[in-house]
Design a protein with these regions (language model features):
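Extracytoplasmic "Venus flytrap"
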Residues: 29-50, 73-80, 102, 170-178
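Short, conserved glycine- and acidic-residue-centered signature motifs
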Residues: 21, 42-45, 148
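Immediate post-signal peptide segment of exported/extracytoplasmic ligand-binding proteins
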Residues: 20-30, 61-69, 159-165
Length: 214
């Protein structure tokens, strides 16, 4: 969380001269999955960002003592259309920058459809899909979590170091899961480890016997 707080503070400092910052204060947005599969994680993530904003605001040193106001919005983690609508609400409300989103799919959608077209900086604390590296962000999108292009390689190295000879891979059927699975699969194969199957699965099912059977 310390890295997140520092990163948020830095990007606030760099963006407050944006023309959307009015004479009375600076509007910031936080968009995370307050509902959906990671709703138990996001309150602490949001609170840490709000702490950074508060420290900057209370310092009295931000653009001659400007104050920061923060608005939260729900990315849902899984519904890109809803996430885009929520992000549009933040921007139309005057947010000059956004902390978020969280899950890779909604993060990419917000970056490409809202943040970049409107010239609004966004910084994700958790989106790790390798595909986000290649989006045409024009310098407006950042993330503090490492790409799965690195994480998948590390997992493959650990698999090799433990002497594993074959693996079966199943992954959450979304941008995050597929990105990590693709990197891991290629990396373990490069280590000479056999991949017996690669299968997607949906979250929250009552029974995964069909996936296990493959």
């Amino acid at each position: 969380m310390r890295k997140l707080i520092i990163a948020v503070f830095l990007f606030v400092s760099s963006m407050v001269t944006n023309s959307n910052a009015d004479g009375h204060g600076i509007k910031m947005g936080i968009i995370l999955g307050f509902t959906g599969p990671i709703e138990s994680l996001t309150p602490a993530m949001a609170a840490s960002a709000e702490l950074a904003f508060k420290e900057a605001s209370d310092s009295g040193s931000l653009l001659g003592g400007k104050k920061i106001s923060v608005t939260r919005a729900d990315s849902t983690c899984v519904d890109s259309a809803a996430a885009v609508t929520a992000a549009e609400g933040l921007v139309s409300g005057g947010a000059v920058a956004i902390m978020g989103a969280d899950c890779s799919g909604v993060t990419g959608a917000i970056a490409e459809k809202v943040a970049v077209p409107n010239g609004v900086v966004m910084i994700s604390p958790s989106a790790t899909s390798p595909g986000l590296t290649d989006i045409n962000d024009r310098g407006y999108f950042f993330r503090t979590a490492p790409s799965d292009a690195r994480g998948g390689q590390i997992l493959a190295d650990i698999t090799k170091d433990r002497g594993v000879k074959s693996v079966a891979i199943t992954y959450t059927n979304n941008d995050y899961g597929k990105g990590l699975a693709d990197v891991y699969s290629a990396a373990v194969k490069a280590h000479g480890i056999k991949v017996t199957t690669v299968a997607a699965h949906e979250d929250g099912k009552a029974d995964y016997s069909s996936e296990v059977a493959t």
